[in-house]
UniProtKB/Swiss-Prot annotation:
Both laminin G-like 2 (G2) and laminin G-like 3 (G3) domains are required for alpha-dystroglycan binding. G3 domain is required for C-terminal heparin, heparan sulfate and sialic acid binding. This is Agrin. Keywords: Calcium, Cell membrane, Developmental protein, Differentiation, Disulfide bond, EGF-like domain, Glycoprotein, Heparan sulfate, Laminin EGF-like domain, Membrane, Metal-binding, Phosphoprotein, Proteoglycan, Repeat, Signal-anchor, Synapse, Transmembrane, Transmembrane helix. Disulfide bonds join 92-123, 97-116, 105-137, 165-198, 171-191, 180-212, 244-263, 252-284, 309-342, 316-335, 324-356, 385-415, 389-408, 397-429, 448-480, 454-473, 462-494, 508-545, 518-538, 527-559, 600-631, 604-624, 613-645, 688-700, 690-707, 709-718, 721-739, 742-754, 744-761, 763-772, 775-786, 818-850, 823-843, 832-864, 1215-1226, 1220-1237, 1239-1248, 1401-1430, 1435-1446, 1440-1456, 1458-1467, 1474-1485, 1479-1495, 1497-1506, 1704-1718, 1712-1727, 1729-1738, 1921-1947. The chain crosses the membrane at residues 27-47. PROSITE patterns: EGF_1, EGF_2, EGF_3, EGF_LAM_1, EGF_LAM_2, KAZAL_2, LAM_G_DOMAIN, SEA. The lineage of its organism: Eukaryota, Metazoa, Chordata, Craniata, Vertebrata. The record marks 1770 as: Alternative splice site to produce 'z' isoforms. Isoform 2 and isoform 3: these isoforms lacking the 'z' insert (z0) are muscle-specific, have no AChR clustering ability and may be involved in nervous system endothelial cell differentiation. GO terms for molecular function: acetylcholine receptor regulator activity; ATPase inhibitor activity; calcium ion binding; chondroitin sulfate binding; dystroglycan binding; heparan sulfate proteoglycan binding; receptor ligand activity; sialic acid binding. The record marks 1745-1746 as: Cleavage, beta site. Monomer. Interacts (N-terminal subunit) with TGF-beta family members, BMP2 and BMP4; the interactions inhibit the activity of these growth factors. Interacts with TGFB1; the interaction enhances the activity of TGFB1. Interacts with DAG1; the interaction is influenced by cell surface glycosaminoglycans and by alternative splicing of AGRN. Component of the AGRN-LRP4 complex that consists of a tetramer of two AGRN-LRP4 heterodimers. SUPFAM superfamilies: Concanavalin A-like lectins/glucanases (SSF49899), EGF/Laminin (SSF57196), Kazal-type serine protease inhibitors (SSF100895), SEA domain (SSF82671). The record marks 1774 as: Highly important for the agrin receptor complex activity of the 'z' insert.
Length: 1950
C-alpha cells in the first residue's frame, strides 16, 4: 500500500530548514550522497528497533497546528473547531468568577461587580478595559462637599465612600520649596505650613510660592536697593541714588521735587516703582508744584503743566508683610494700606501686624478620645483617626488578641473602632493556638480558616497522596480543608512506580523509586531551607530526595550569616546586625532585659500538645516549642513533617544521572538547571519574574505567563492579594501559607473586599467592627443593618426585603439574600442603570444595588448614552430637535453593518448588495444654526473630563483611564434630554458608534471627524515577531482590514503599544495609537500612526527612542520585535502623510463594519504638495482600522412618501457625493476627473477638513505691512514679539513726509535699536540683549515727550531722551511693519542706518494697550507686499544662505551649517571674522555659529580680546568661571588613578547660571564613538553618563538643581553599576547595558579631560548627548580626594576667568587675617591659619610658652601619651561646667565624630614616626592619624570604606618649629604645614563619621591595629618635640589632660 500523501495548507506549510536548502543543489553527486545517507539511516533505524515477531505500523501523520500563527488577545485562547478540525477560533475561557461584591470601575465607564468580571468583559468584548478605580463608576468624589481648614486636608477613605480632614504627620517625600504663609511667615514647604497650622490650630494657608519677602536676604547690600516686582514677585536689584556721580545739575521731576541730577531722579523713581520724568532743567518752580499739600499719602503729579495730587503715584512693591487695619481688612504691606487711604480719602489706621482673620479654631478646647485628632471639617470640630502609619514591621499583640504591624497601627485601629486597645506584649499574638496544615488564624473569632481562592495556572502537580492537582495551590487548599499532611511529590501528573508514587524528585527505574545523582553539578554554594549549605542546587535536590523531606533553595550562597561587627561601615549602630538576626528568628530586641537583649517570649504552656518534626531531626512537643528553640539558637529551623520524627528512609541512588535540561525540547533556562517550557525561555524564572513570597516557584505558564500563586494570592506574578483577601505582608513576615480571607459580614458590609494592610471592611452606616459585624448596645445586626428589635424572624411572612433582596428560610430562620452575580449568557450584555451608571450586566446591577442599599432599576439595555438623574426616566414628547441630534445610526433589518450618520435630517442606509432597498424616514425638524449646534455639542461633551485613578503607575496618563466619556450619543427620536443637575459620569467614547477621535478622548460626531481636535502624528514601522506572548506569521488575510484576523491582531498590537507609550518618557504628550497597515516583512511589518498633543516638542527620534527603551524593559513576551531593535523600530521624520486619510471614526463597536466616507476625487501627483512630517490631523481614530471605501450615504433630502421612479442614467460626477465639508462649495473640474472645494472662512484643505489656524506674518527682507498712522504726539506705549533670521532689519517705522519727525524700531548689529526724533534731533536707545536668530523675543518701549525707554526680554529699561527743543511727535505716513516700500528706503536708511526689512516673523504688536490683529492682517492692513505665513518649524522657510543646511534645535532655534567661505548665523557673511586674528598674542580665535569671533584666552589673561593681564591672586584659591564657550583641558582621568577602568569616585562643586551645559567629559576616541564618562546639565537636571562599550548608562538626578547656588555632586562607578548623589539627597543608581559575550566592565580612556566645555563637541561621543558649554563657576573637581583644578594638571585653558563672586576670591577684604588661607566650602569658607594664630578668621594670637615649660614635651620614640578625645581633664573636675566653656562639638567621650580638628607645632629631625592617632587599638576599624613618612607629614583617615592619604609638600625634618593644621568635616579632609597651600581630599561615598573608642594618642602606639595596611613609618614612635596642641578648637594641656602619664620631660632648647 503506497504511503498516504501529507496534506498541508499552503500558508501552514513549514519552511524548509537551512540544511535541506543547502542540499537542494542541482548536482548528481549531491543527490546520490543524499539518497545513500538517507537509506543507510533508515536501515540502522530499522535494525535498532526490530524485534522478531512484532509488527508495527507507521505513526499517522500529525495534523497541522491550526492555532499556529493565530493571535488571540485579551485573555482568549485558540481552540480548534469541533466540526472542522482544519479551522480554529479564539474563545474566552469559561471561568466562574467568585460570587464576591467588590465593585470596580472600568476604563469603559462601566461598573463591574469585581475585577474578575471586568476581565471577563474584556475578553468577551475583545478590547482593553483597565481597572480605573475601586468602587462603582457613578460614585462622586467624597471630597467634593468637604471643606478642610486650619491646616487639614481632605483624604478619601479606601472604599471611596467617605472623606476625612487629616493633618499631615510627616513631610517625607513631599515636594520641597519655600512658600509664604498667610501669616507672613516663610515655611520650608507647603506641607510644613499645614503641619504648623494643624499643630497650633491656626487658620494659615499658602499665600504665595516662594518667600514672603524675596528681598529679605539682600538687606545688607550697601550698593543696591532690593524691590519686589508686584507682578512677578521677583526681586529687582536697583542701584542706590547715593552712589550716583556727584555732579550738581539739578532737574525738576514731574512730582514737583528738585533732584540733584538725572541719575538721582531715575534711581529714586525706580526704587519707588515709578518712571519719574523731567519737567525742566534747574530748580522746580512754584507752578511745577501742587498748590496745596497732598493729603492721605497722595503724591504730586505734573501732567501737561498742570500739577495735581494723585494716587496713581502711590505704587507698592510685592513684598508680603501683612498689616491688619482698623477697617478689618488685611493689606499685603503697609504701603497698600496707605494707597487705600489715598483712594478712599480717609484715614485707615493700622491695628496690628499680621492678618486680621484670626478666627479661633473650633477645635480649641475640644477633647478627642481614643487617640483621635481634632480637625475642622466644614467649619465644625471633628475628631478624626490617623490612618497612615509609616515605618517598618514591628508586630505587637493587642489586648483584643489581634496582632498589629506596629504600635501605630494598633493605636489607629483603636481610634477607628472607638475602643481602648492596649499593647499586651511585643511580638505577634497566638489567639488561635496552633493552626495546622496551612490554615490561618482569624483573630476576631479565634478560628483557623483556610484560604480557598486559587488563580488558575496550567501547572499540575502530583501530591504525596497519589492524586494529581491542577496547581500547587489547589494541593495546599485540599490539605488545609481536609486537615491532612500533603506535599508535592513531583511536578506534572502523577505517575505510579509499581504501587507507590515517587516523591521529592525521585524517578521510577525498573519498578523502583531512585534518586538521581549529581555527577557534574554547576558550581556555587546554595543555602537550603533546612539551614544547611550545599555545594550546588543539584546536591540540595539530591539530599531532599535521599532524606524524603521538602528542602527548598532559600538563597544563593552559604547559610552562615555575616558576623556582626566585623569591620565598621563608619556609621550606624554596632548592634544593628544583632537586632536584625534576633528579629529574623522571632525574637524581640530589648536593651533593658536582664537575660540578654534578644528576648524569646514564647508562652507554650497553654498550647495543646501536637508533636512536630523539626528540620534538625528533633521532635518538638508543639510548633511553639520549635519556634522558641529557633529563636534561642538563632538558627534556621522549620517544621519538616507533622508528628514525631522517624528514621529517614533513604531512597537508593540512581546509577546514572537524570537527563539534563539541555536534552529537553526547549532547552535550559539561564540557570542551566531548570528546563524551559517553551521557545524564547518561556516559563523560565528570568522571564516570569514571579514574586518569591506570593508564588511557589520561579516558573510560570509558558503561554499566559501566570505564576503558581499561593492561596488567596493573585496577579500575573503573584504579587498581590486577590479581592476578598488581605495581609500579603503576613506571608513575608509571619510565614503565612497565603493571603488571609477578609470574611466581611455581608449584612453589615457594602463590599466583600477589605483594606490590604488592616483587613478592615467597608461598613454600612451605623455598623462597626473590623468585619462590620458589631452594633451599638441594644441593637442587633439584621438584613437592614443594625436594628433595635433583636428578634430574628422565623418565616418569610414576617420579613420585608428591600432593594431587590429575596427572602430565604434556612436553619429555622428567615433572612434577606441579595441576588447572585451569575447571569445566563443571554443576559450578559451591559445595561444602563437609573442612576446614570453603566453596569456589566443585569445581575451585577441588581447585586451591587442590593449590597449598597440603593434603589436602582434598568433604564435601558446597552451603555448609558446621556446622564440620567437617579430615579428619573426620560419621557417622550414632541419637540423641535436640532438636526445633528436626529442624525442617528439607522440600521437596515437586513444589514448588520451600522452606518455612519449623515449631516442632514434624512438618512439613506446603504443596503447589502443582496438585500432589497429599504427606505427609513424620520420626522421633519427645524435645522439648527451652526452656533446652536456648536453650543449643544459643547454641552454634550463638557463632562468628558478625567477622573481620579487608582494610583497604579500603569494607569497614569492612560487614555482610557482618563474617564473620557462619549456623552454625545443622541436620545431616541422624539425624546427629551432630562437634565436634573450635573451628570454623575458618562460612558467612554469607545461606547459610541463612531468611536474616538485621534486624541483618544473626544467622541466623533460624524465619520469625517469634524469635531475632532488636531493632533501631531508620527508614522512608525515595526518588524514584529510576536505580541502578547504569541508568535506572529504573516498571511494574506492580514492585508484585508475587514478580516477578523486583521481586527484581532490590530487590537492586540494597539493595546500593547498603548501600554508601552503610556509608561514611556513621552507619555505626557501621547494621546493614542492606530495600526495603519499590516504587511509582509521578515515576519510581520506593522505601520502605525502615533498621535500626540499638537503642541508637543517631541520629534520622531524622541518617539522612537522612548519606545525602544520601553521594549527593552518590558515583559519579553509583551511585544517581540526583531533584533537588533534599532534596525526594526523606525519612526519617520520626513514623509508625505495626507491629513485626510489619518483615521476614521472606527470605535471598537463599529470596528470594521463602519463605512468611512471619503472623497471619490483622484488626487493627482501634481496637485499634492508634499509637506514636512509629522503631520497635524483632526481625524477620529479608533482601536481598529476601517477600510477605505468610495461609497457615501447620499446627503440630498428626498421625499419619504413619494416612491422613486427610475430615470435616465448619467455619468456620476465627483460633486454628487458632496465631498466638501463644513459648508464648502464643490465645483467639478472640466476634465471630469476631480473637483475643487471653495471653503468658508476659517476652513482649509482639500475638502475643507482643516481648521485654518490664525496665521503669523512672515517677512523676507523686502516684505512689509502698512497700517494707519500712529497717534503718538506726546505718549506712546508699544510691545512687539518677533523672531529674526538675520541680525539686521527694520521692525517698525512711522515718519513725517515733510518734516524730520519719525519713530523707528530696527535690528542693528544683533541688537534692538529704538530711534525717534521730535524735530530737534534724534534719540537713540540700544538694548543690551543680543538677538538670537530663530528665537522669539519680546520688546517693550514707551515714549513721553522727549523721553523714551526700551526693554528687550525683561531687561532693565534703557532710558534716553532727544535733544531739547520741540517735544511733540508729528507723524503722517503709514505705519510700516516688517519693512518698507522701495520709495521709502533711502529716507529711512539715512535716519536709521538700516535699509532692509526684517527677515523673520512678527506675531504680536500692541500699541497703547490695543493689540493689532496680525493673525488676520489681510483685513486690517492698508497695504501689504510679499508677506507670507510663518511656520512652526524654524527651518521653514530655510533661513540659511549659500545652500547651507538648516538644523532645527530646541525652542524654535535653528543652526546653519555653513559651507567653507561663509560665516554668520545664516551664512550670509563672506568675510572670516578671525582674519586677521584680533586676539592678543597667541590666543586662538574661534568663529561663532551665531556670528562674530571669540578669543580663547589662556590662563592669566581675560577680556574680549585677551588684552587684560590678571593680577596674581597670591594664596587665593582658583575658582574657574566659564561663559558657555570656554573650557579647561586637563590630563586624562586615567593618568591619576591606576584602577580607574574598574571603579571611579569623583566629586564636583559648581554654581550654574545656565540650565544646560557640559561639566566634564573624558573619552577614548575623537570620532564620536568609544568609551567615555561625562557629567552635564540638561534643563537643570544633572546627567551622569558613561559607556563601557555596549551603550551608555544614563543616571539622571530626580530633582532639578537651583541656578545661582553652589551644588555638590558625587559620582561613583564600580564596574557597570553607577551612582549619582546631589548634596545630601538620595543616591540615584544606574547600570550600563550588559553583553552576553563580553563583560564590558572596564572604562578605557585615552583622551584629555575637558572641564566646562570642549573645543569641538562633534568629536565627543554621541552617547554623551552634549552640544553646549557650561555657564557658571566650578570650585572643585576631586578624584578620590585629589583636587584636579590646579595649575600642574591644566594643559590648556581657553577663555577661563577667575570667579570673583566667592568670599575667598574677592579682590578686597580677604576674610582670613594674618596671612591665613581661605578654603572654599561651597558658598562659605574656612580659614587655615599660619603658626601662632587661631580662630575662625585667624584673628587670635597664640601665646608662646617658655622653653622649659612642660607644655613643650619631648618624645624619644617610646613616649606614648593617651588623652580623651576633645576634652580636658580640667573640665572634668567641675561638677557643673561653666556655660562659656561648653562647646556643642565636644562631648566628654566622643566616639562617633562627624568632624575632627587638630593644630600643633612640631620640631623634629626624624624622617619616620607616628605623631597622632585616633582609633581603636587592636582591631581593624576607623582611624585618623598624623605621621611623618620620608620626611613629609601625612594625614590619613579611614571611615570604613577606603583610606584617604593627604601628603604635605613641606619637609618637616628640618629641626625647626612648624605649625600643623589638620581638619576633617564628614568625608572632606585638609592638611596644612606652615604657609603652604592646604592639601585637600575626600573619602569615597559612604560613611561620614569616625567611630573610635574615644582615645587620642600622641607620640605613637605600642602596637598597631591588626589588619590595617599602613606604612612602616606608622609603627615607629615619634622623635622630636610638640607644643601648642589644639583639639577640636580647644587648647590641650599636655600634662594635666594626659590619661597615661609616662615619664615626661620638656623639650631642650636649641
Amino acid at each position: 500500500m503506497p504511503p498516504l500523501p501529507l496534506e498541508h495548507r499552503p500558508r501552514q506549510q513549514p519552511g524548509a530548514s537551512v540544511l535541506v536548502r543547502y542540499f537542494m543543489i542541482p548536482c548528481n553527486i549531491c543527490l546520490i550522497l543524499l539518497a545513500t545517507s538517507t537509506l543507510g539511516f533508515a536501515v540502522l533505524l530499522f535494525l535498532s528497533n526490530y524485534k522478531p515477531g512484532i509488527h508495527f505500523t507507521a505513526a499517522p501523520s500529525m495534523p497541522p497546528d491550526v492555532c499556529r500563527g493565530m493571535l488571540c488577545g485579551f485573555g482568549a485562547v485558540c481552540e480548534p473547531s469541533v466540526e472542522d478540525p482544519g479551522r480554529a477560533s479564539c474563545v474566552c475561557k469559561k471561568n466562574v468568577c467568585p460570587a464576591m461584591v467588590a465593585p470596580v470601575c472600568g476604563s469603559d465607564a462601566s461598573t463591574y461587580s469585581n475585577e474578575c468580571e471586568l476581565q471577563r468583559a474584556q475578553c468577551n468584548q475583545q478590547r482593553r478595559i483597565r481597572l480605573l478605580r475601586q468602587g462603582p463608576c457613578g460614585s462622586r468624589d467624597p471630597c467634593a462637599n468637604v471643606t478642610c481648614s486650619f491646616g487639614s486636608t481632605c483624604v478619601p477613605s479606601a472604599d471611596g465612600q467617605t472623606a476625612s480632614c487629616l493633618c499631615p504627620t510627616t513631610c517625607f517625600g513631599a515636594p520641597d520649596g519655600t512658600v509664604c504663609g498667610s501669616d507672613g511667615v516663610d515655611y520650608p514647604s507647603e506641607c510644613q505650613l499645614l503641619r504648623h497650622a494643624c499643630a497650633n490650630q491656626e487658620h494659615i494657608f499658602k499665600k504665595f510660592d516662594g518667600p514672603c519677602d524675596p528681598c529679605q536676604g539682600s538687606m545688607s547690600d550697601l550698593n543696591h536697593i532690593c524691590r519686589v516686582n508686584p507682578r512677578t514677585r521677583h526681586p529687582e536689584m536697583l542701584l542706590r541714588p547715593e552712589n550716583c556721580p556727584a555732579q550738581h545739575t539739578p532737574i525738576c521731576g514731574d512730582d514737583g521735587v528738585t533732584y540733584e541730577n538725572d541719575c538721582v531722579m531715575s534711581r529714586i523713581g525706580a526704587a519707588r516703582g515709578l518712571l519719574l520724568q523731567k519737567v525742566r532743567s534747574g530748580q522746580c518752580q512754584t507752578r511745577d508744584q501742587c498748590p496745596e499739600t497732598c493729603q492721605f499719602n497722595s503724591v504730586c503729579l505734573s501732567r501737561r503743566g498742570r500739577p495735581h495730587c494723585s494716587c496713581d503715584r502711590v505704587t507698592c512693591d510685592g513684598a508680603y508683610r501683612p498689616v491688619c487695619a482698623q477697617d478689618g481688612h488685611t493689606y499685603d504691606n503697609d504701603c497698600w494700606r496707605q494707597q487705600a487711604e489715598c483712594r478712599q480719602q480717609q484715614t485707615i489706621p493700622p491695628k496690628h501686624q499680621g492678618p486680621c482673620d484670626q478666627t479661633p479654631s473650633p477645635c480649641r478646647g475640644a477633647q478627642c478620645a481614643f487617640g483621635a485628632t481634632c480637625t475642622v471639617k466644614n467649619g465644625k470640630a471633628v475628631c478624626e483617626c490617623q490612618r497612615v502609619c509609616s515605618g517598618g514591621y514591628d508586630p505587637v499583640c493587642g489586648s483584643d488578641g489581634v496582632t498589629y504591624g506596629s504600635v501605630c497601627e494598633l493605636e489607629s485601629m483603636a481610634c477607628t473602632l472607638g475602643r481602648e486597645i492596649r499593647v499586651a506584649r511585643r511580638g505577634p499574638c497566638d489567639r488561635c493556638g496552633q493552626c495546622r496544615f496551612g490554615s490561618l488564624c482569624e483573630v476576631e473569632t479565634g478560628r483557623c480558616v483556610c484560604p480557598s481562592e486559587c488563580v488558575e495556572s496550567a501547572q499540575p502537580v502530583c501530591g504525596s497522596d497519589g492524586h494529581t492537582y491542577a496547581s500547587e495551590c489547589e494541593l495546599h487548599v485540599h490539605a488545609c480543608t481536609h486537615q491532612i499532611s500533603l506535599y508535592v511529590a513531583s511536578a506534572g501528573h502523577c505517575q505510579t512506580c509499581g504501587e507507590t508514587v515517587c516523591t521529592f524528585g525521585a524517578v521510577c527505574s525498573a519498578g523502583q523509586c531512585v534518586c538521581p545523582r549529581c555527577e557534574h553539578p554547576p558550581p556555587g554554594p546554595v543555602c537550603g531551607s533546612d539551614g544547611v549549605t550545599y555545594l550546588s542546587a543539584c546536591e540540595l535536590r539530591e539530599a531532599a530526595c535521599q532524606q524524603q523531606v521538602q528542602i527548598e533553595e532559600a538563597r544563593a550562597g552559604p547559610c552562615e550569616p555575616a558576623e556582626c561587627g566585623s569591620g565598621g561601615s563608619g556609621s550606624g549602630e554596632d548592634n544593628a546586625c544583632e537586632q536584625e538576626l534576633c528579629r529574623q528568628h522571632g525574637g524581640v530586641w530589648d536593651e533593658d532585659s536582664e537575660d540578654g537583649p534578644c528576648v524569646c517570649d514564647f508562652s507554650c504552656q497553654s498550647v495543646l500538645k501536637s508533636p512536630v518534626c523539626g528540620s534538625d531531626g528533633v521532635t518538638y512537643s508543639t510548633e511553639c516549642h520549635l519556634k522558641k528553640a529557633r529563636c534561642e539558637a538563632r538558627q534556621e529551623l522549620y517544621v519538616a513533617a507533622q508528628g514525631a520524627c522517624r528514621g529517614p528512609t533513604l531512597a537508593p541512588l540512581l546509577p546514572m544521572a537524570s537527563p539534563h535540561c539541555a536534552q529537553t525540547p526547549y532547552g535550559c533556562c539561564q540557570d542551566n538547571v531548570t528546563a524551559a517550557q517553551g521557545v524564547g525561555l518561556a516559563g523560565c524564572p528570568s522571564t516570569c519574574h514571579c514574586n518569591p513570597h506570593g508564588s511557589y516557584s520561579g516558573t510560570c505558564d509558558p503561554v499566559t505567563g501566570q505564576c503558581s500563586c499561593r492561596p488567596g494570592v493573585g496577579g500575573l506574578r503573584c504579587d498581590r492579594c486577590e479581592p476578598g483577601f488581605w495581609n500579603f505582608r503576613g506571608i513575608v513576615t509571619d510565614g503565612h501559607s497565603g493571603c488571609t480571607p477578609c470574611s466581611c459580614d455581608p449584612r453589615g458590609a457594602v463590599r466583600d473586599d477589605c483594606e490590604q494592610m488592616t483587613g478592615l471592611c467597608s461598613c454600612r452606616p451605623g455598623v462597626a467592627g473590623p468585619k462590620c459585624g458589631q452594633c451599638p448596645d441594644g441593637q442587633a445586626l439584621g438584613h437592614l443593618g443594625c436594628e433595635a428589635d433583636p428578634t430574628t424572624p422565623v418565616t418569610c411572612v414576617e420579613m420585608h426585603c428591600e432593594f431587590g433582596a429575596s427572602c430565604v428560610e434556612e436553619a429555622g430562620f428567615a433572612q434577606c439574600v441579595c441576588p447572585t452575580l451569575t447571569c445566563p449568557e443571554a443576559n450578559s450584555t451591559k445595561v444602563c442603570g437609573s442612576d446614570g451608571v453603566t453596569y456589566g450586566n443585569e445581575c451585577q446591577l441588581k447585586t451591587i444595588a442590593c449590597r449598597q442599599r440603593l434603589d436602582i432599576s434598568i433604564q435601558s439595555l446597552g451603555p448609558c448614552r446621556e446622564s440620567v438623574a437617579p430615579g428619573v426616566s426620560p419621557t417622550s414628547a414632541s419637540m423641535t430637535t436640532p438636526r445633528h441630534i436626529l442624525s442617528r445610526t439607522l440600521a437596515s433589518p437586513h444589514s448588520s453593518l451600522p452606518l455612519s450618520p449623515s449631516t442632514t435630517a434624512h438618512d439613506w442606509p446603504t443596503p447589502l448588495p443582496t438585500s432589497p432597498q429599504t427606505v427609513v424616514g424620520t420626522p421633519r425638524s427645524t435645522a439648527a444654526t451652526p452656533s446652536d449646534v456648536a453650543s449643544l455639542a459643547t454641552a454634550i461633551f463638557r463632562e468628558s473630563g478625567s477622573t481620579n485613578g487608582s494610583g497604579d503607575e500603569e494607569l497614569s496618563g492612560d487614555e482610557e483611564a482618563s474617564g473620557g466619556g462619549s456623552g454625545g450619543l443622541e436620545p431616541p427620536v422624539g425624546s427629551v434630554v432630562v437634565t436634573h443637575g450635573p451628570p454623575i459620569e458618562r460612558a467612554s467614547c469607545y461606547n459610541s458608534p463612531l468611536g474616538c477621535c485621534s486624541d483618544g478622548k473626544t467622541p466623533s460626531l460624524d465619520s469625517e471627524g469634524s469635531n475632532c481636535p488636531a493632533t501631531k502624528a508620527f508614522q512608525g514601522v515595526l518588524e514584529l515577531e510576536g505580541v502578547e506572548g504569541q508568535e506572529l506569521f504573516y498571511t494574506p488575510e492580514m492585508a484585508d482590514p475587514k478580516s477578523e484576523l486583521f481586527g484581532e491582531t490590530a487590537r492586540s498590537i494597539e493595546s500593547t503599544l498603548d501600554d508601552l507609550f503610556r509608561n514611556s518618557d513621552v507619555k505626557k504628550d501621547f494621546w493614542s495609537i492606530r495600526l495603519r497597515e499590516l504587511g509582509p516583512g521578515k515576519l510581520v511589518r506593522a505601520i502605525v500612526d502615533v498621535h500626540f498633543d499638537p503642541t508637543t516638542a517631541f520629534q520622531a527620534p524622541d518617539v522612537g527612542q522612548a519606545l525602544l527603551q520601553q521594549i527593552q524593559v518590558s515583559r519579553p513576551w509583551a511585544l517581540a520585535v526583531r533584533r537588533p531593535l534599532r534596525e526594526h523600530v523606525r519612526f519617520l521624520d520626513f514623509d508625505w502623510f495626507p491629513t485626510f486619510f489619518t483615521g476614521a471614526a472606527t470605535g471598537t463597536t463599529a470596528a470594521v463594519a463602519t463605512a468611512r466616507a471619503t472623497t471619490v476625487s483622484r488626487l493627482s501627483a501634481s496637485s499634492v504638495t508634499p509637506r514636512v512630517y509629522p503631520s497635524y490631523t483632526s481625524r477620529p481614530v479608533g482601536r481598529t482600522t476601517a477600510p477605505l471605501t468610495t461609497r457615501r450615504p447620499p446627503t440630498t433630502t428626498a421625499s419619504i412618501d413619494r416612491p422613486r421612479t427610475p430615470g435616465p442614467q448619467r455619468p456620476p460626477k465627483s460633486c454628487d457625493s458632496q465631498p466638501c465639508l463644513h459648508g464648502g462649495t464643490c465645483q467639478d473640474l472640466d476634465s471630469g476627473k476631480g473637483f475643487s472645494c471653495s471653503c468658508t472662512a476659517g476652513r482649509a484643505g482639500t475638502v475643507c477638513e482643516k481648521v485654518q489656524l490664525p496665521s503669523v506674518p512672515a517677512f523676507k527682507g523686502h516684505s512689509f505691512l502698512a497700517f494707519p498712522t500712529l497717534r503718538a504726539y506726546h505718549t506712546l506705549r508699544l510691545a512687539l514679539e518677533f523672531r529674526a533670521l538675520e541680525t539686521e532689519g527694520l521692525l517698525l517705522y512711522n515718519g513725517n513726509a515733510r518734516g524730520k519727525d519719525f519713530l523707528a524700531l530696527a535690528l542693528l548689529d544683533g541688537h534692538v535699536q529704538f530711534r525717534f526724533d521730535t524735530g530737534s534731533g534724534p534719540a537713540v536707545l540700544t538694548s543690551l540683549v543680543p538677538v538670537e536668530p530663530g528665537r522669539w523675543h519680546r520688546l517693550e518701549l514707551s515714549r513721553h515727550w522727549r523721553q523714551g525707554t526700551l526693554s528687550v526680554d525683561g531687561e532693565a529699561p534703557v532710558v534716553g531722551e532727544s535733544p531739547s527743543g520741540t517735544d511733540g511727535l508729528n507723524l503722517d505716513t503709514k505705519l510700516y511693519v516688517g519693512g518698507l516700500p522701495e520709495e521709502q528706503v533711502a529716507t529711512v536708511l539715512d535716519r536709521t542706518s538700516v535699509g532692509i526689512g526684517l527677515k523673520g516673523c512678527i506675531r504680536m504688536l500692541d500699541i497703547n494697550n490695543q493689540q493689532l490683529e496680525l493673525s488676520d492682517w489681510q483685513r486690517a492692513v492698508v497695504q501689504s507686499s510679499g508677506v507670507g505665513e510663518c511656520g512652526d518649524h524654524p527651518c521653514s522657510p530655510n533661513p540659511c544662505h549659500g545652500g547651507a543646511l538648516c538644523q532645527a534645535l530646541e525652542a524654535g532655534v535653528f543652526l546653519c551649517q555653513c559651507p567653507p567661505g561663509r560665516f554668520g548665523p545664516t551664512c550670509a557673511d563672506e568675510k572670516n571674522p578671525c582674519q586677521p586674528n584680533p586676539c592678543h598674542g597667541s590666543a586662538p580665535c574661534h568663529v561663532l555659529s551665531r556670528g562674530g569671533a571669540k578669543c580663547a584666552c589662556p590662563l592669566g589673561r581675560s577680556g574680549s580680546f585677551c588684552e587684560t593681564v590678571l593680577e596674581n591672586a597670591g594664596s587665593r584659591p582658583f575658582l574657574a568661571d566659564f561663559n558657555g564657550f570656554s573650557y579647561l583641558e586637563l590630563k586624562g582621568l586615567h593618568t591619576f588613578e591606576r584602577d580607574l577602568g574598574e571603579k571611579m569616585a569623583l566629586e564636583m562643586v559648581f554654581l550654574a547660571r545656565g540650565p544646560s551645559g557640559l561639566l566634564l567629559y573624558n573619552g577614548q576616541k575623537t570620532d564620536g564613538k568609544g568609551d567615555f564618562v561625562s557629567l552635564a546639565l540638561h534643563n537643570r537636571h544633572l546627567e551622569f553618563r558613561y559607556d563601557l562599550g555596549k551603550g551608555a548608562a544614563i543616571i539622571r538626578s530626580k530633582e532639578p538643581i537651583a541656578l545661582g547656588t553652589w551644588v555638590r555632586v558625587f559620582l561613583e562607578r564600580n564596574g557597570r553599576k553607577g551612582a549619582l548623589q546631589v548634596g545630601d539627597g538620595p543616591r540615584v543608581l544606574g547600570e550600563s547595558p550588559k553583553s552576553r559575550k563580553v563583560p564590558h566592565t572596564m572604562l578605557n580612556l585615552k583622551e584629555p579631560l575637558y572641564v566646562g566645555g570642549a573645543p569641538d563637541f562633534s568629536k565627543l561621543a554621541r552617547g554623551a548627548a552634549v552640544a553646549s558649554g557650561f555657564d557658571g563657576a566650578i570650585q572643585l573637581v576631586s578624584l578620590r580626594g585629589h583636587q584636579l583644578l590646579t595649575q600642574e594638571h591644566v594643559l590648556r585653558a581657553v577663555d577661563v576667568a577667575p570667579f570673583a563672586g566667592h568670599p575667598c576670591t574677592q579682590a578686597v577684604d580677604n576674610p582670613c587675617l594674618n596671612g591665613g588661607s581661605c578654603i572654599p566650602r561651597e558658598a562659605t569658607y574656612e580659614c587655615l591659619c599660619p603658626g601662632g594664630f587661631s580662630g575662625l578668621h585667624c584673628e587670635k594670637g597664640i601665646v608662646e610658652k617658655s622653653v622649659g615649660d612642660l607644655e613643650t614635651l619631648a618624645f624619644d620614640g617610646r613616649t606614648y601619651i593617651e588623652y580623651l578625645n576633645a576634652v580636658t581633664e580640667s573640665e572634668l573636675t567641675n561638677e557643673i561646667p561653666a556655660p562659656e566653656t561648653l562647646d556643642s562639638r565636644a562631648l566628654f567621650s566622643e566616639k562617633a565624630l562627624q568632624s575632627n580638628h587638630f593644630e600643633l607645632s612640631l620640631r623634629t629631625e626624624a624622617t619616620q614616626g607616628l605623631v597622632l592617632w585616633i582609633g581603636k587599638v587592636g582591631e581593624r576599624a576607623d582611624y585618623m592619624a598624623l605621621a611623618i613618612v620620608d620626611g613629609h607629614l601625612q594625614l590619613s583617615y579611614d571611615l570604613g570604606s577606603q583610606p584617604v592619604v593627604l601628603r604635605s609638600t613641606v619637609k618637616v625634618n628640618t629641626n625647626r618649629w612648624l605649625r600643623v593644621r589638620a581638619h576633617r568635616e564628614h568625608r572632606e579632609g585638609s592638611l596644612q604645614v606652615g604657609n603652604e597651600a592646604p592639601v585637600t581630599g575626600s573619602s569615597p561615598l559612604g560613611a561620614t563619621q569616625l567611630d573610635t573608642d574615644g582615645a587620642l594618642w600622641l607620640g605613637g602606639l605600642q602596637k598597631l591595629p591588626v589588619g590595617q595596611a599602613l606604612p612602616k613609618a606608622y609603627g615607629t614612635g615619634f622623635v622630636g618635640c610638640l607644643r601648642d596642641v589644639v583639639v577640636g578648637h580647644r587648647q590641650l594641656h599636655l600634662l594635666e589632660d594626659a590619661v597615661t602619664k609616662p615619664e615626661l620631660r620638656p623639650c631642650p632648647t636649641l
